[in-house]
Curated annotation (Swiss-Prot):
Span of domain CARD: 1-91
Domain of life: Eukaryota
Name this polypeptide is given: Putative caspase recruitment domain-containing protein 17P
Compartments where located: Cytoplasm
Gene: CARD17P
Main localization category: cytoplasm
Length: 110
């Protein structure tokens, strides 16, 4: 599942993600109602460094479960191809329900 993939990529995500991608992800997660405005503000205001924000963001998404993680992965693949490549992520080409990592392919239920 997507949550397992994000857990496996957590350290690398925290080290690699930029502030622009974090802000874009926060916007996407608010728009898709994965995170509330309050949760967004906590990530932005209570974490001083980009790495702290990345850690708080990813941990919040992982706690929300596999569908939330898939939204996060899809956003990364569509909006930050360099980060997606660094993490070995790619979203499925058609339905968005396929997640391919360097190690395995996971098919998420529709």
């Amino acid at each position: 599942m997507a949550d397992k993939v994000l857990k496996e990529k957590r350290k690398q995500f925290i080290r690699s993600v930029g502030e622009g991608t974090i802000n874009g992800l926060l916007g996407e997660l608010l728009e898709t109602r994965v995170l509330s405005q309050e949760e967004i503000e906590i990530v932005k205001c209570e974490n001083a460094t980009v790495m702290d924000k990345a850690r708080a963001l990813l941990d919040s998404v992982i706690r929300k479960g596999a569908p939330a993680c898939q939204i996060c992965i899809t956003y990364i693949c569509e909006e930050d191809s360099h980060l997606a490549g660094t993490l070995g992520l790619s979203a499925g080409p058609t339905s968005g329900n396929h997640l391919t990592t360097q190690d395995s392919q996971i098919v998420l239920p529709s």
